[in-house]
Amino acid sequence: MVNAARRADKTALAARKPTEYLLRSDPGLLSPTMVYKLTAEGFEMKDVQDMLSISDLYSAEKVLTRIVGKSARTIQRQSKGNQTVRLSSVQSAVAFQFATLLERATKVFGTQMLAEEWLGRPCRYLEGEIPLDVVSNPVGFQVVNDCLERIEYGVYQ
């Protein structure tokens, strides 16, 4: 009974796209400059945590630690007060890359479950690297995005 309720909550949460959690708006309604400005301001930690919570893979792989570069314990300690914790612009850009990638992979593979499966296992196009492991680097993010584009358009080498 509890699992069914939890799944229903997750389904309701997943109705929002990952980038919508961070931007607090539909990214299609924002100009690229506005997205840049919001990222430069820094996303709120709570919004990043909410975005990560919709993904079993992102939760299991401790993506928040990858984004902020701090241990889970340090993050918890900093988040305890009543103050709003904001990520730096660099951390926010990395969070946005993870959100964008999950959206793109979901679009390409049709479901978030299939997208997460692909993101979490070695990829031949990435010379055996796991897509999730290379996303926090801007060049790695672009390589994974290019790979998804090739899959989407049926271009394999």
Predicted regions and their residues:
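Non-transmembrane "mature" sequence context
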Residues: 1-157
